[in-house]
């Protein structure tokens, strides 16, 4: 009984204790909100530390382990400056009310201190409380950037390259991301011309307007440079800026306008003096270029021999002066280095010794030799055999042309070889094959009465048994022969300074059609301008071999470097008289201040890179004077074709003429 009483008492006490515990638990506070972390992007903010270099467009993400009471968030999560100025922000609660995102409504200031405060007003969904916390951050230092830049109302942001900017009125507007210090502003901005500039600041000193104080060069590339030393008024650094634009072409005629016929005569006369006045004084041959010193070129001098004929006929020199020069030229050709009758590409005009064109090309050059022979044959027909002195010159020319051993240059094969070296033999191993500028080499070889080649050498070697055929249409023009789009225009010049293409044809092509259409393809390609090079147009065209800003190259539609060579369009005048005459007027009147010099048109130009040659090359000068003459009178064509050996040679190869 007593034992039962004790047990009963224990049960009563236990019930009373449990009841008391439950009552006490119900009266305990609900608890505390647990914050997991605060992040800006991938960066976790730490209590008691200042997080630096945060972006000015940052959002703050707050993560909690508890479910929050959304109604308590506004007013409890705050972003303030260090002076307690509040930052208007958008606040979102999401992720089942366990996450808060605070995003400032405007970008924060650069290099400024801020504090993110979460106050005790924040509550959990079950009444949990939060003790409050604060995080310190500093924004990244600002960078001065260009928000907008225009030139004469054209966009000037890289990579845009504005064109046709009025060289007299340049107006560049630049808006920056921060205000500028007006002091010494002009020291940070420059145009490549180096001229003084006018500056105007506006829009709270964030916009600078630059204008020129004097005219810029026309048709030129001009750079705007903004120094990386520029800083904003707040001290923000700048990365620098460089871009360029092209000024518009001044179309005002640079020389008095004269009749076209007079202009053609002027061009011929100026070009003639390259071969006459600038010829090497010791030998009378043409220097390779205007900077080549004693180096004379055989091929270019062959063109120069034909230029002598034009000079006499046009009255630039007397016949006696021309014959005196011819006598000097022949004397040199008779005594200088020769190899099986052929000359080297380059010779020293003072001593007559070979100047290697390349280390292995130090002997005969049969193609260059053929250009000289073309000129000598043409001159031979111009001379008067009834005049004793001229008959002597004719005989000397025969001796020179008959000495060329074309048959030896076949090496017993049905093809001609281009080079031979006295110490390296056939090391160059270059066959002369078409279609290109070397047709005349096979023509003069076939006309030789002393060392001729058979027709099989032409058909198998040059024509490759028909492999030279093309037959495709480009821009609507059929191209009978050669590479796509025809290649450089010197293909239509060198062989045809003497060889008359007007009625020339064989089983492979009509050569008048070939040359006319290749010229028209070149013209059309240029004004179509698929590479958007500056300057190309219907009146500014012509791709051929010439100097260029990087050296020398054979420009063509398939090797377009942005370089226009006047000799290409000018020398095409026999094939494209309208297109060539338009180019001639443009080159002379519009570009003459840049393109016209002592010996006529300079070699080439590339306005895209601001390059204008000051060079003259014999092989570009020769086609100009000779092809203009063939257009005007057919003189050189008629002379060459009148040679009693030429037509039989052409007939042997299967040509009609």
Question: Which sequence ranges carry the predicted segments?
Answer:
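Acidic, low-complexity Ser/Thr/Gly/Pro-rich repeat segments typical of extracellular/periplasmic
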Residues: 24-252
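Intrinsically disordered, low-complexity serine/threonine-rich segments
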Residues: 8-11, 522
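Bacterial N-terminal signal peptides that target proteins for export
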Residues: 1-9
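Ser/Thr/Asn(+Pro)-rich, low-complexity disordered segments
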Residues: 251-657
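Short, solvent-exposed coil/turn linker segments
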Residues: 2, 55, 119, 163-167, ...
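C-terminal motif of bacterial Sec signal peptides marking the signal peptidase cleavage site
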Residues: 17-20
